[in-house]
């Protein structure tokens, strides 16, 4: 077991009850272009087209064999584009249950599949996009091979679902998915301390337990300790629900679009786990579930998710949470004179620091305006990786990609710096800054 000592479990109220309930049905689903870094789409459909579940919506110009398929059957109702015609989302109004069939295999034959058979089925079904590389967090090139594949079956994000609850319902499919992935590369199954999961004893699968505060459950943490990456070495990672989907695909020949997500946050009337579907419309999902007021829906974690609004009002491809916060749009009178009983800080600046175990109703307010970066040891307190966070963040801010690489930037994704953004007195958002640097590194070296 690997024990993480540095980090932070955000003391936010509204944690979900770890029991799965059916969510209200949604009328539309979507694929979000923002989820796929560096992807340039070649559209295969247009508005008004009727599509089947699993039908190709678009492919990647850089990797034409990588297909992005429909998460539901129905009619393409909108293709949203932003500045410079960047793809924002492809929306499907659900209608019917027509679906494409893909290759299926007996469960006892999965261990004999060739890597080519596995790749072909994942590519044709669109489930290849469940995989992401590290470095760069992109959908992998089908011609590439990873050093290893990391399955994240632990979740320490604030307000997250317990993976063990979800996997318990789909144990056979999860084990089948692990078997299939093992045909591509060795698999690290990362789990919580004291948890037993299906497939741990499979040949080619190495189970590793992690404990401690967040980010003990992030793939970046697991990769750093078990199989570190660099400029000449890459690994792939995916979450536990995509492993289940892969197992379902290979044993049934059909796409499994179910998603169990945490509907939680301080403004949620009944925080719980809900059963919905990939790419679900979050406005519809949250309707009638929140306290009255001006609230924000976040696809993903409160630390590293994105605002779900307009063209982006859908569940992200890699997200397993719908987090809901009150908009922090009201300024407090003489806030600097208050004791801060209802505010949280990593530093000893509020009275709340003395109230151990207290949960806070966080809002979207940053509690301050942007200012200079101040190195007071707060980054080191939440960074468990063997890197120098203050120095790395400074080089990322000024865009010195050479020094950023030397200090470990290639090991990181936006979510790995989310806690640094949270504890930053200067109110920097390090995730987008890291992404800009990674894009430059990939283009220029």
From Swiss-Prot:
It comes from the Bacteria. It catalyses: a ubiquinone + n Na(+)(in) + NADH + H(+) = a ubiquinol + n Na(+)(out) + NAD(+). InterPro entries: NqrA (IPR008703), NQRA_2nd (IPR056148), NqrA_C_domain (IPR022615), NQRA_N (IPR056147). GO terms for biological process: sodium ion transport. Pfam families: NQRA_2nd, NQRA_N, NQRA_SLBB. The keyword Transport applies. Keywords: Ion transport, NAD, Sodium, Sodium transport, Translocase, Transport, Ubiquinone. Its EC number is 7.2.1.1. One of its GO terms (molecular function) is oxidoreductase activity, acting on NAD(P)H, quinone or similar compound as acceptor. Composed of six subunits; NqrA, NqrB, NqrC, NqrD, NqrE and NqrF. NQR complex catalyzes the reduction of ubiquinone-1 to ubiquinol by two successive reactions, coupled with the transport of Na(+) ions from the cytoplasm to the periplasm. NqrA to NqrE are probably involved in the second step, the conversion of ubisemiquinone to ubiquinol. PANTHER family: NA(+)-TRANSLOCATING NADH-QUINONE REDUCTASE SUBUNIT A. Belongs to the NqrA family. This is Na(+)-translocating NADH-quinone reductase subunit A. The gene is nqrA.
């Amino acid at each position: 077991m690997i024990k993480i000592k540095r980090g932070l479990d955000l003391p936010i109220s509204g944690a979900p009850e770890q029991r799965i309930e059916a969510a209200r049905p949604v009328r539309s689903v979507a694929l979000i272009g923002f989820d796929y870094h560096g992807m340039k789409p070649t559209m295969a459909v247009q508005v008004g087209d009727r599509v089947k579940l699993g039908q190709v919506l678009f492919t990647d110009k850089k990797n034409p064999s990588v297909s992005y398929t429909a998460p539901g059957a129905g009619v393409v109702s909108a293709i949203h584009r932003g500045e410079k015609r960047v793809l924002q989302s492809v929306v499907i109004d659900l209608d019917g249950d027509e679906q494409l069939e893909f290759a299926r295999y007996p469960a006892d034959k999965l261990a004999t599949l060739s890597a080519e058979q596995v790749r072909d089925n994942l590519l044709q079904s669109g489930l290849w996009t469940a995989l992401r590389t590290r470095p760069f967090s992109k959908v992998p090139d089908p011609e590439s091979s990873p050093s290893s594949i990391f399955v994240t079956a632990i979740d320490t994000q604030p307000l997250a679902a317990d993976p063990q609850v979800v996997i318990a319902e789909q144990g056979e499919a999860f084990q089948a998915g692990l078997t299939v992935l093992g045909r591509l590369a060795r698999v690290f199954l990362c789990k919580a301390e004291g948890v037993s999961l299906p497939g741990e004893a499979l040949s080619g699968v190495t189970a590793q337990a992690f404990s401690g505060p967040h980010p003990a459950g992030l793939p970046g943490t697991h990769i750093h300790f078990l199989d570190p990456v660099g400029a000449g070495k890459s690994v792939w990672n995916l979450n536990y629900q995509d492993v289940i989907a892969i197992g379902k695909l290979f044993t049934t020949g059909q796409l499994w679009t179910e998603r169990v997500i945490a509907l939680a946050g301080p403004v949620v009337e009944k925080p719980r786990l809900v059963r919905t579907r990939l790419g679900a419309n979050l406005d519809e999902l949250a309707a009638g579930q929140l306290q009255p007021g001006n609230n924000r829906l976040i696809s993903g974690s409160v630390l590293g998710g994105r605002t779900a609004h307009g063209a982006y009002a859908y569940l992200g491809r890699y997200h397993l949470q719908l987090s809901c916060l009150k908009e922090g749009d009201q300024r407090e009178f003489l806030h600097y004179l208050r004791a801060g009983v209802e505010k949280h800080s990593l530093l000893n600046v509020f009275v709340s620091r003395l109230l151990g175990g207290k949960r806070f109703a966080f809002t979207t307010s940053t509690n301050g305006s942007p200012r200079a970066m101040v190195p007071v040891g707060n980054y080191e307190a939440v960074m468990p990786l063997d890197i120098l966070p203050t120095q790395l963040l400074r080089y990322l801010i000024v865009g010195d990609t050479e020094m950023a690489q030397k200090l470990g930037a290639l090991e990181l994704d936006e979510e790995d710096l989310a806690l640094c953004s949270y504890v930053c007195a200067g109110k920097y958002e390090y995730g987008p800054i890291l992404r800009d640097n990674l894009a430059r590194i990939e283009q220029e070296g």
